[in-house]
Every structure is written in structure tokens, then in C-alpha cells.
Curated annotation (Swiss-Prot):
Protein name: Ribonuclease Y
HAMAP family linked to this entry: RNase_Y
Membrane-spanning residues: 6-26
Origin organism lineage: Bacteria, Bacillati, Bacillota, Clostridia, Eubacteriales
KH domain residues: 203-288
NCBIfam families in the record: HDIG (TIGR00277), RNase_Y (TIGR03319)
Role played: Endoribonuclease that initiates mRNA decay.
Primary subcellular site in the record, as a coarse category: membrane
Broad enzyme group: hydrolase
Key word Protein transport present: no
Species of origin: Clostridium botulinum (strain Hall / ATCC 3502 / NCTC 13319 / Type A)
Ranges of residues in domain HD: 329-422
Length: 513
């Protein structure tokens, strides 16, 4: 056999093998397809079974849920029915209670109507009895109804008037005791903490001379030296028999101080003639001006007051040379400032404002001889001019009652001013003014009806009035004292305060036989 034959056999074998392989593959594929079909049918059957089971389960759950909902609805319906029944029972009970109350009210109304009728019957009977009694009383007393009313009203009026006077006296006494106690405490604390050291001053200065020959040199040839000094200073020089002394007299204390300084310098210098006098007077004026400024600054330093206008400080310094009833006005102002500040502290009020007003309250006295009007009003205008606050301006103007006080500080300064002025030894007045004041006091008292005698005692600080007991009763004495106080306050000027003491004495005398 040749190679071609082998090749053909090989090809045939290969073809046969391929055909067998294809057959085997096809067979296996058909087997797999059959198995897959079976598996698909199986899975489909299982899925159908599962779906049927779930459907049945869902239907069962839905039935159970419906059953639960039905049970819940039935329960709620039962509860609502029970609540409605309960409310119906309550309404029925309330209706029954209202019926009972209505019945009770009807019974009460009926009883009240009966009582009202009885009351009307009693009132009618009482009116009849009252009319009978009134007629009988008129017949017995001989007075008409109107006359009896007037008599009773007069009796009641007298009783009420007496009781009112007694009540007023008790209230006034109690209020005065309380007010006096508190005022004494405040004033005592203030006075204890304020120690003022100054004395009353006069309207004259005495200049000591080294010898009596100096008097002639002061007078000068034909009196030219003394005339020059008096003309330049406006002060009277009194040269009399008083050994080694010359008296300077004048009501302007600043001029008097200028004259004193100038005269003392002339005496020390020894050269006394008109030209030298004029030179010394000019020097003295400058010294006094410097002294005025220093005194004003010292006053503000002592009281702790700052921020004053320079002109107010100068006016304060001028007060050193001003007196009131012999009391130095600058020292008085400083004392009032301290007292007002201390009392303000005790009362819980701003002490700085009270001290400021106290220091400036008499500032008007520095120019009152140059400007017309009360010094309080002048002072308030000066304070306003130099831009002090409205409270300070008002307090200065109100410290003597010329203006209505608008602050507690104004009242405190009034009190401090009175305390400083009334302090024993602080002030004095001329004999003539003193006598006139005593006479006027007794005259005011004697003008009142029912006064038997009156005496001004305690240097005019008390008026003692003896009244006729048959003319005035105790109530009348109280009223008289109050009226006399008002009249004294309106008609008299006086330092401090005046006590009005009305005395009513009744004596009963019998003799045993």
C-alpha cells in the first residue's frame, strides 16, 4: 500500500472520529436540555406552590387584621356608649338638683315676702308711734321739732368742737414730740461735729497810738490830714480824750478796714501829710482786695467747695467785713455750710449741694448796700448770673422765705441758718431795736380778746400771756397761741425763735364756817 492509501485511511478515520464526536456531543446536549427542562418545570412548580402559600398566608393575615380592627371599633363604640350613658345620668342628676333648688328658692322667696310684709307693718306701726311720741314731746317740752333739732345740733356742735380741739392738741403734741426728737437728734449730731470759733464784731475800730502827740499829727494843720483821710476812706475819725487811741467809725466794714490799715502804716512811717495819706490809702485798698480774695479762697477750702466762679469767691471774701447783728457773715456762712452738710449726711441727702448752698446763702449781703432788694433775692440773682445750678439759686432765694423752696437742701439751709443765728452769743442787736421788739411782742399779745396781762421775758425769746378764765376756755387758749405765733412771724423780725406761752388759771375759793 502506498502513502496515499494511508492518508485516505487516516482521513476516513478522522472523519469517523469527528462524526462520532459530534454525535456524542449532540447526545450530551440533548440530555442536558432535557435535564434543564425538567429543572425548569420543577422550579416553576415550586414557585407556584410558594406563591399559593404566601397568598394564603396574606389572606389569613388580612383576615386577622380585619378581626382586630373590628374588635377595636366595637370596644371604642362600647366606651362611647358608656360615656354617653354616664353623661346622661349626670344631666338627669343636675336637672333633679336644679328642680330642688328652684323649689327651695320659691319657698325662700315666699318666706321673704312674708317677712317684708311684716317689716312694712312694723315700720308703719313705728311711724305711728314716732308721730305720737313727737307730738307728746312737743306738748311736754313746749318746743317745736325745728327748735328741738337746733338745740340738739348746738349741743352736738359744742361737743364735737371740744373733742376736735382735744384731738388736735393730742395729735399736735405727739407730732411735735416726734418731730422735735428727730430734729434734736439731727441738730445735736450736727452741732457736736461743728465747732465754730468766731466772735461778734462791731461797727468801730480802735487804733492804738504810740503817744498823744500823734493825735495832733493825724489832725494836721487846720485839720487837713484828718479831712483827707476821711474823704479818701469814707470813714469818720473820732479823736477824743481817750489816751493813746483813735476811733474809726463807719458802717462800711471794708472802708473801715482800709482806713485802719492806712492809719497804722502812717503811724509807723511817721510822715503824715495829704500826699502820703493818699499813697497809703491806695496801698491799703490793694491789701484789702488781696485779703478779700484770700479769705474767699480760704472759705472754699474750709468747706471743701470747688468750681466757684472767681467773682463769687471775691464776694465771699467781702463777707468777712460784713456783720449781721454783730455776727461776722463770712464765719456765719462757713458755719451754716458745715451745719447743712452734717445734717444732710444724717438725713441721707447729698451733703455737697447742701454745703454749697450754705456757703453762698448770704452772698447777697456782699452787695446789698449797692443793690436794692432783699439780700436773699439779690444773692439768688448773683448765683444765677455766675451759672450756679437752679437748685442752688432757689435755695439761696428761699432761705428767708422770699421764694418757695424746691428742694430738701433749701429747707436744711433754712434750719442751719436759724441754728447759727440763734446760737447763744452769736448775734446781738441794738438797745433801741431790742426795746421796740419787746414792746411790739407785748402789744401783739394784749390786742387779743381775753388777755389779762402779758410779759416779754428771756430777752424777748418768750412771751408769757395770762388770760381771763371766764372768757377763754382751754380750746381758746390753743387757738390764741397759734394766732399770736402767726402774727409774730408776719410782723416781727428777730434772731432765733420766740416761745408763746398762754396760761389759763382757774381758782375756786370757799370758806368753811
Amino acid at each position: 500500500m502506498g502513502p496515499t492509501k494511508y492518508i485516505i485511511i487516516a482521513v476516513v478515520i478522522i472523519i469517523i472520529c469527528v462524526i462520532l464526536g459530534l454525535y456524542i456531543v449532540d447526545k450530551k446536549a440533548k440530555e442536558k436540555l432535557s435535564e434543564a427542562s425538567k429543572e425548569a418545570r420543577r422550579l416553576k412548580e415550586e414557585a407556584e406552590r410558594d406563591a399559593e402559600a404566601k397568598k394564603k398566608e396574606a389572606i389569613l393575615e388580612a383576615k386577622e387584621e380585619a378581626h382586630k380592627l373590628r374588635a377595636e371599633v366595637e370596644r371604642e363604640n362600647r366606651e362611647r356608649r358608656n360615656e354617653v350613658q354616664r353623661l346622661e345620668r349626670r344631666i338627669i342628676q343636675k336637672e333633679e338638683a336644679l328642680d330642688k333648688k328652684s323649689e327651695a328658692l320659691e319657698n325662700k322667696e315666699e318666706a321673704l315676702n312674708k317677712k317684708q310684709q311684716k317689716i312694712e307693718d312694723v315700720e308703719t306701726h313705728m311711724e305711728e308711734l314716732h308721730e305720737k311720741q313727737r307730738t307728746e314731746l312737743e306738748r311736754i317740752s313746749g318746743l317745736t321739732t325745728e327748735q328741738a333739732k337746733e338745740f340738739l345740733l348746738e349741743q352736738v356742735r359744742k361737743e364735737v368742737k371740744h373733742e376736735t380741739a382735744v384731738m388736735i392738741k393730742e395729735i399736735e403734741t405727739k407730732a411735735k414730740e416726734e418731730a422735735d426728737k428727730r430734729a434734736r437728734e439731727v441738730i445735736t449730731y450736727a452741732i457736736q461735729r461743728c465747732a465754730a470759733d468766731h466772735v461778734a464784731e462791731t461797727t468801730v475800730h480802735v487804733v492804738n497810738l504810740p503817744n498823744d502827740e500823734m493825735k495832733g499829727r493825724i489832725i494836721g494843720r487846720e485839720g487837713r490830714n484828718i479831712r483827707t483821710l476821711e474823704t479818701l476812706t469814707g470813714v469818720d475819725l473820732i479823736i477824743d480824750d481817750t489816751p493813746e487811741a483813735v476811733i474809726l467809725s463807719g458802717f462800711d466794714p471794708i472802708r473801715r478796714e482800709v482806713a485802719r490799715i492806712a492809719l497804722e502804716k502812717l503811724i509807723v512811717d511817721g510822715r503824715i501829710h495829704p500826699a502820703r495819706i493818699e499813697e497809703m490809702v491806695e496801698k491799703a485798698k490793694k491789701e484789702v482786695e488781696i485779703s478779700i480774695k484770700e479769705e474767699g479762697e480760704q472759705a472754699t477750702f474750709e468747706t471743701g467747695i470747688h468750681g466757684l466762679h472767681i467773682e463769687l469767691i471775691r464776694l465771699l471774701g467781702r463777707l468777712k467785713y460784713r456783720t449781721s447783728y454783730g455776727q461776722n457773715v463770712l464765719k456765719h456762712s462757713i458755719e451754716v455750710s458745715h451745719l447743712a452738710g452734717l445734717m444732710a449726711s444724717e438725713l441721707g441727702i447729698d451733703p455737697t449741694l447742701a454745703k454749697r448752698v450754705g456757703l453762698l446763702h448770704d452772698i447777697g449781703k456782699a452787695v446789698d448796700h449797692e443793690v436794692e432788694g432783699p439780700h436773699a433775692i439779690i444773692g439768688s440773682e448773683i448765683a444765677k448770673k455766675y451759672r450756679e445750678s437752679a437748685l442752688v439759686v432757689n435755695a439761696i432765694g428761699a432761705h428767708h422765705g422770699d421764694m418757695e423752696p424746691q428742694s430738701l437742701e433749701a429747707i436744711l439751709v433754712q434750719a442751719a441758718d436759724a441754728i447759727s443765728a440763734a446760737r447763744p452769743g452769736a448775734r446781738r442787736e441794738t438797745l433801741e431795736a431790742y426795746i421796740k421788739r419787746l414792746e411790739k411782742l407785748e402789744e401783739i399779745a394784749n390786742e387779743c380778746e381775753g388777755v389779762e396781762k402779758s410779759y416779754a421775758i428771756q430777752a424777748g425769746r418768750e412771751i408769757r400771756i395770762m388770760v381771763k378764765p371766764e372768757v377763754l376756755d382751754d380750746t381758746g387758749c390753743i387757738e390764741m397761741a397759734r394766732n399770736i405765733v402767726k402774727q409774730i412771724e408776719s410782723e416781727l423780725e428777730y434772731p432765733g425763735q420766740i416761745k408763746v406761752n398762754v396760761i389759763r388759771e382757774t381758782r375756786a375759793i370757799e370758806y368753811a364756817k
